[in-house]
Amino acid sequence: MNYYFTKGKPQLVNMKTPIYLVTQFQQLMDLMQNQYEVSCLELMQRSGKAACDFLVYRWPKVKKISIFCGRGDNGGQGYVLAQQAKKMGMVPTVWQVGHQMSMSKPPQMHKEVWYEMNSCHQQGIVLHTYSPDIDLGDPELIVDALFGVGLYGHVRPEIALLLQRLQQFTVPILAIEVPTGINASTGEIAGNALAATATITFLCMKLGLLINDGKIYSGEIAFDDLLAPEAIYQQVKGIEESSLLDSSTFFSKKIWYRNKTQKGWQLSIN
């Protein structure tokens, strides 16, 4: 049972969002790029812009935001968010974790991430290299763009210390795709994890956000389908939620939806 709030009044509607494992999500991404010819850069830009849209919708008064970017695609989404935030009048501070600004593409960094990193630089957004002893200032909101679904194994000790440091802030935390330290398929903690106030996830709902520790650490969930065609969800079937999720999984869970037919966000409380 989903309730969507329109002008403060709940309306009962019937809407299902496909739930997927990470391996299935990767199949969807491959289809988007190879069959539907949506480039990796375009997907990164769509997701980063959607994340910024949700941030503004959810916390309209926030101005100073700190974005922690890893060197993978999740970091690229964070760089896109930073650019959008600046265009919308916010003051973004970008913290590069595990890498730094470079005029040539670093090894093991995807060209799309490097492109967005340089786009930030060209737009006058200062990129700071994170270190444990650096002053993080007083942000009004923190964006977790460190790993997303790209975390394999346990969180490294230096990242665990960063997560502990960020958790001490008393400001909202928005995670992009998946909170750092949460396994996107199992919902288990990979050694250490950052509890988010809200998580925005793309293309499909990840099972790990809804079960085990993931349903706690993800906070509210926002979902954007990145303009994916409906046919893609028939080509890669999601899991049957009834076979994997107990009846209490969605209880009091706030899930914000947006798809290609909507301009705004709708709130579902199951």
Curated annotation (Swiss-Prot):
K(+) binds at residues 74, 144, 180. The keyword Metal-binding applies. It catalyses: (6R)-NADHX = (6S)-NADHX; (6R)-NADPHX = (6S)-NADPHX. This is NAD(P)H-hydrate epimerase. Binds 1 potassium ion per subunit. Its cofactor is K(+). HAMAP family: NADHX_epimerase (MF_01966). Its EC number is 5.1.99.6. GO terms for molecular function: metal ion binding; NAD(P)HX epimerase activity; nucleotide binding. (6S)-NADPHX binds at residues 73-77, 148-154, 177. Keywords: Isomerase, Metal-binding, NAD, NADP, Nucleotide-binding, Potassium. Catalyzes the epimerization of the S- and R-forms of NAD(P)HX, a damaged form of NAD(P)H that is a result of enzymatic or heat-dependent hydration. This is a prerequisite for the S-specific NAD(P)H-hydrate dehydratase to allow the repair of both epimers of NAD(P)HX. The keyword Isomerase applies. It comes from Legionella pneumophila serogroup 1 (strain 2300/99 Alcoy). Residues 25-234 form the YjeF N-terminal domain. It comes from the Bacteria. Belongs to the NnrE/AIBP family.
